[in-house]
UniProtKB/Swiss-Prot annotation:
InterPro entries (alphabetical): Aldolase_TIM (IPR013785), NanE (IPR007260), RibuloseP-bd_barrel (IPR011060)
Family: Belongs to the NanE family.
One CC-aspect GO term: cytosol
The protein, known as: Putative N-acetylmannosamine-6-phosphate 2-epimerase
């Protein structure tokens, strides 16, 4: 297992490359109760030249770590109804991810009500206090959320949740305006969410982002097939 990179070192690694999100949830075609599928996707991503992997769950991350030394952005998706945040939503999930020695832990940093009752700045401060050497990524949906996370000391701001909160911009593709605004504010941005084509990724890279995550367009074959099928119907 490689040593955990510094922020500067990781930014060098990620610059100008693609981080591939390798995830499948129960009910999706590539989900398996016994595991073994996500590391194959990660291996394919590595062979293609990916600079990092985003993965969900302790099991999947451990399996991916066994086959690649690429830096991993790790999350744990767990629902805490009636609250909506479910991406690394409490310290319990942070603790589980911190034990895996991954490069970055990503967590929901939207302004929505949280299961733990904390505001996002307080949550970030608690995590940083407990794990001062752990790089952190805020999954946000608006500029203001990104700014709050940045001011609380988060290392990277991801546009992951734009379009997935009711109050954020609802775009069919990536929220380029949000990415650009965050970059102009001097924030280390990891662009993520609805990036469907190499052309979109290139356009986003030119904005000066710290990294780009692509998921569905690479690792969700059902979604990819649907895009082709819908195109023929129009």
């Amino acid at each position: 297992m490689p040593d955990k990179p510094t922020k500067e070192k990781l930014m060098e690694q990620l610059k100008g490359g693609i981080i591939v999100s390798c995830q499948a949830l129960p009910g999706e075609p590539l989900y398996s109760e016994t595991g073994g599928i996500m590391p194959l996707l990660a291996k394919a991503a590595q062979e293609a030249g990916a600079v990092g992997i985003r993965a969900n769950s302790v099991r999947d991350i451990k399996e991916i770590q066994a086959i690649t030394d690429l830096p991993i952005i790790g999350i744990i998706k767990k629902d805490y109804p009636p609250q909506e945040p479910f991406i690394t939503a409490t310290m319990t999930e942070v603790d589980q991810l911190a034990a895996l020695n991954i490069a970055v832990i990503a967590m929901d940093c939207t302004k929505r009500d949280r299961h733990d009752g904390l505001d996002i700045a307080s949550f970030i401060r608690q995590v940083k206090e407990k794990y001062p050497n752990q790089l952190l990524m805020a999954d946000i949906s608006t500029f203001d959320e990104g700014l709050v996370a940045h001011q609380a000391g988060i290392d990277f701001v991801g546009t992951t949740l734009s379009g997935y909160t009711p109050y954020s911009r609802q775009e069919a593709g990536p929220d380029v305006a949000l990415i650009e605004a965050l970059c102009k504010a001097g924030i280390a941005v990891i662009a993520e969410g609805k990036i469907h084509s190499p052309e979109e990724a290139k356009k986003i890279n030119d904005l000066g982002v710290a990294g780009i995550v692509v998921g569905g367009a690479i690792t969700r074959p059902k979604e990819i097939a649907e895009r082709f099928i819908e195109a023929l119907k129009s």
